[in-house]
Design a protein with these regions (language model features):
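Conserved alpha/beta enzyme-core scaffold
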Residues: 1-244
Length: 244
């Protein structure tokens, strides 16, 4: 079977009110960008027609403006975990418009696997390449892994993949994809030296669970640090004085 190539708008049309979506990435690195932006546009259209449309978003860490920012501004987020740094999103949370859980990032995949955050409907993943081997598909992640293997395995409605040409296919091989056991059966992670590998360089799924592939070329939404002001400069001086 070949993979079904669709547009970001066609992918967004698959997402329904109340769905829970899990995203790849960790900070803005490796986060899907074209589909979340289209989901925000869909939400605006639904709201203009008087229809309810809000989704739950699970990620590995923070995301960029095309996800947290646009979706928050479109009033499209019902629940969000575990972490964000987006100013627009923060404003909507503080206005009591979004339910937000600031979980410890290292516990996020475990919380999902053990059912504390409900069922995952869709996984939306950014990849540099997708290969098919028999009935299996190999998803090669881009700049970050995050909760990708967990949400890909648990997404009950399917997996949507953004193949982002901004990231070179030389990314293939940089990841060591591995899921630890759930409590109380967790065993030691057998990494004894920096060169040890315990998983696979890709996320493996049943090929028929991939409902569409979107081709795009979008850079990661990296943020620059703000220039220091008088207050942050004084904080730095205080810390330096304390240490010295």
């Amino acid at each position: 079977m070949g993979f079904n190539k669709i547009t970001a708008a066609e992918a967004a049309a698959l997402i329904q009110n109340g769905d829970t979506i899990g995203l790849s990435g960790f900070t803005p690195a490796g986060v899907p960008k074209s589909v979340p932006a289209e989901i925000a546009r869909k939400a605006e259209k639904e709201h203009a027609e008087g229809k309810e449309f809000k989704i739950n978003i699970l990620t590995g860490a923070s995301t960029g403006q095309s996800c947290d920012g646009m979706l928050a501004n479109a009033h499209a987020i019902k629940f969000r975990a575990p972490y964000t740094t987006n100013k627009d999103f923060r404003t909507h949370v503080n206005n009591n418009e979004i339910s937000y859980s600031d979980l410890n990032l290292s516990n996020m995949a475990t919380q999902i696997r053990q059912g504390y955050l409900g069922q995952v409907d869709w996984a939306i993943i950014e990849a540099c390449e997708v290969e098919q081997t028999g009935g299996k598909a190999r998803i090669y992640l881009t700049a970050a892994g995050g909760i990708s293997p967990t949400v890909c395995r648990l997404a009950r409605k399917g997996i949507i993949i953004e193949v982002n040409a901004f990231h070179s296919k030389k990314c293939m091989g940089i990841h060591d994809v591995y899921e630890i056991e759930d409590h109380p059966y967790r065993t030691p992670i057998m990494i004894m030296k920096a060169s040890d590998r315990i998983g696979k360089p890709y996320v493996e799924v049943d090929a028929d669970r991939i409902k569409g592939i979107i081709e795009c070329n979008i850079p990661d939404e990296a943020r620059a640090f703000k220039a220091p002001d008088a207050i942050t400069t004084q904080i730095g001086n205080n810390v330096a004085d304390f240490l010295l």
